[in-house]
Regions:
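Glycine-rich phosphate/diphosphate-binding loop of Rossmann-like nucleotide-binding domains
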Residues: 37-46, 121-210, 217-224
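Anion-binding alpha/beta catalytic cores of soluble intermediary-metabolism enzymes, centered on
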Residues: 3, 84-137, 194
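Rossmann-fold NAD(P)-binding glycine/threonine-rich loop
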Residues: 98-111, 208-256
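Short, well-structured alpha-helical segments in soluble
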Residues: 69-80
């Protein structure tokens, strides 16, 4: 088994980002908005704040309700000291999610989720960075399980645009195991812990778990020596934080030039 560890790679990227921040006339600032009752993303929120502190970037947190979030986004859009804005999903009121994401200034949408955004979605960007760093060849049949806005859909869209053969699976897929067994490279990002079982993965496959906060791979998959596989935690997660701050630094350079 080959583990696709992202922690060390993210550490190298962090040092590069620290040097880039030191070279800026004004350090960028990141604003994170989350719902009052959303504690599911606290692990990644802590990772983002720690990363920002390590590279010299202030990270401000705003806890909002469905009634206050759009006003907060508008204020942050107009605040010239704020370089990037993240909406920490999920929001407590799903009906406000589309409105909130659409309200973010595309020039500050460093998560890459707003319509017309200037940036590549952070988790797909991180996922492909991780594979490239480990010299994983994306040749072959790619299967993406989950078509959510954070990972599955933008990842599949990017792979298709790059000419890869991609099968998309979601809740409407009738025989998921049959689909995943065709994958040379299998990505999963559904939010369902333990979804992918050993008998759903072909011999020698590459398996990438983007699930958060809990992994989507059955622990027994890590007993298979034939697989190339991401750990969780320590795989895509640290790389996603690095990709997010990479987008923030791009935004900083754009705003200061």
């Amino acid at each position: 088994m080959k583990l696709l560890n992202g922690t060390d790679i993210a550490g190298f990227i962090k040092e590069r980002h620290r040097q880039q921040v030191a070279g800026l006339e004004h350090p960028p600032k990141l604003a994170i908005i989350r719902s009052q009752d959303n504690e599911a993303g606290d692990r990644y929120l802590k990772m983002k704040r720690a990363y920002g502190q390590d590279i010299g970037v202030p990270v401000d947190l705003y806890v909002e309700t469905a009634g206050t979030i759009l006003g907060r986004i508008d204020a942050l859009n107009r605040d010239r000291s704020v370089t990037g804005i993240i909406i920490q999903l999920p929001l407590s009121d799903p009906d406000i999610t589309d409105k909130a994401l659409a309200a973010v200034d595309p020039r500050k949408d460093v998560d890459g989720l707003a319509p017309g955004t200037n940036f590549e979605a952070a988790t797909p960007k991180a996922t492909l960075w991780l594979l490239a760093a480990h010299n994983v060849d994306l040749a072959g049949h790619v299967v993406v399980v989950g078509q959510g806005r954070l990972v599955g859909k933008p990842l599949a869209d990017r792979l298709v645009a790059s000419g890869h053969q991609v099968t998309r699976c979601d809740i409407h897929t009738q025989d998921l195991p049959a689909a995943t067994r065709q994958a040379d490279i299998l990505f999963t990002g559904t939010g369902q812990p333990g979804l992918i079982k050993p008998d759903m993965v072909k011999a020698g496959a590459v398996v990438v778990d983007t699930g958060a906060p809990k992994g989507e791979l059955d622990p027994a998959l890590y007993d298979r020596p034939d697989l190339t596989i991401t750990p969780n935690p320590g795989g895509v997660g640290p790389m996603t934080v690095a990709a997010l701050f990479d987008n923030l630094l791009i935004a900083a350079h754009q705003s200061q030039n």
